[in-house]
A protein has these predicted regions:
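Histidine-/acidic-rich catalytic cores in large beta-rich domains
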Residues: 1-120
């Protein structure tokens, strides 16, 4: 599973392809055949409407749920955290300002357990 930010590589060995530029970022999971040395995409999550987050983003699996971090969404003006359930359906989205527009506001999202959280 990976977060494909859609940005071609900026630092690859000389002569190596930089990769394809995509119009939007996607999360994809692959089935890998180590003998044939091939990979086949088995599912993907495309945020609707489409988002582009060119750097710093990630996806995290916790059990059968997923946490998607679009760290530089909306032309790097916001960070968006999206929760997906076991059916990979969006169950929540949190959007917050990304002052400065870089990777300092958000990087790798990690689930925080709120089961024992109490407010006084």
């Amino acid at each position: 599973m990976l977060f494909n930010d859609g940005t071609p590589s900026l630092n690859q060995p000389e002569g190596a392809p930089a990769g394809q530029a995509l119009g939007a970022s996607v999360v994809s999971a692959y089935q890998i055949d180590p003998v044939a040395r091939t990979a086949r995409e088995v599912w993907r999550f495309d945020h609707q409407p489409e988002l582009s987050s060119e750097f710093c983003s990630s996806v995290y699996q916790a059990g059968s749920s997923y946490l998607v971090n679009d760290a530089m969404a909306d032309n790097a003006a916001t960070a968006r955290i999206v929760g997906l359930d076991a059916n990979r359906q969006q169950v929540f989205e949190l959007s917050y300002a990304n002052p400065g527009g870089g990777c300092a506001t958000s990087w790798n999202a990690v689930p925080v357990p709120f089961e024992q959280l109490q407010f006084d």
